[in-house]
């Protein structure tokens, strides 16, 4: 089941597929059993990148540190 269309936002934000995959893996570690929270956090991260609040590289670093 898909809750949020984070992939479209990621595409609009210019996030490369390999970077999105890396972000997905990191977020999945935080929410291994909760698909809705997993997708919500991905959507929020992609929106922050799209709006210029952060970059994909910064998002990957901050997720790794969490």
Please annotate each region the language model reported.
Residues 1-31:
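N-terminal acidic leader/helix
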Residues 35-66:
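Long, compositionally biased
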